[in-house]
Amino acid sequence: MSSRGTVLEAERLVVGYAGAPVCGEMSVAVGAGEVLGVVGFNGAGKSTAARTLAGRQLPISGEVKVHGLLANPDAVAFRREVSAVFDEDLFFPSLTVREHLLLVARGHSLPDPEEQVEEELSFFGLQERADVVPESLSSGQRRRTLLAAGLMRPASLLILDEPEQRLDPVMREALGRRVRSLADGGATVVLVTHDPQLLLDTATSCLVIDDEVTLATPEVAAAIIAGA
């Protein structure tokens, strides 16, 4: 546990749909500056667990807290503490990439919002697509736009659900450095991934999701997904 204190706590958490669990019970505490990797086979329940940790859906039982605030889709104070990126996240169809990012920057009162947006466009290689609407983007470009928006938001907890999907190797490596830098700055990160190298580059501990949920070192977790 980080000496800077616990940020995310999940206590006897069971996740699933319509009362049916998708994986085993889990309990975990993650501190400031730590990166929790989440791994498991396809369909094991990783994304469901991540959505529950993000407060996007309610657990079947147990609880999730961030800085002591109980997770709930309707809890405004909780949502302010969390930035999450999921593949199903939506865009405003009439806004361009730049306009989306400016909306995030201004909505969170970031200093120099235009400058920060330009930095994100550059980091994710979106400068040439900055003034087009989402329907004109490739799936990879949409993914990078979602990541740019998620990483811009000031939050105690950042949750990334398979962020490596549709990213080339160079961008995956850059994303790993960015995640590590955010954690070094005090952010708590939950990283759902199938990428062993991204896990090794970023994670400080891991959850292995299956019928039973276990804690593992990044090295053990990376070996599990490399052999999947």
Describe these PLM feature segments:
Residues L158-E162:
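Catalytic Walker B motif of ABC-type/P-loop ATPase nucleotide-binding domains
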Residues G62-L70, F78:
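Conserved ABC transporter NBD signature motif
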Residues A54:
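Helix-to-loop junction immediately C-terminal to a conserved catalytic motif
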Residues T193-H194:
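H-loop/switch region of ABC-family ATPase nucleotide-binding domains
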Residues L102, D112-R129:
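Conserved ABC ATPase "signature" region
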Residues G150-L151:
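ABC ATPase C-loop
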Residues V133-L137:
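Conserved ABC ATPase signature
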Residues L95-G107:
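Q-loop/switch helix immediately C-terminal to the Walker
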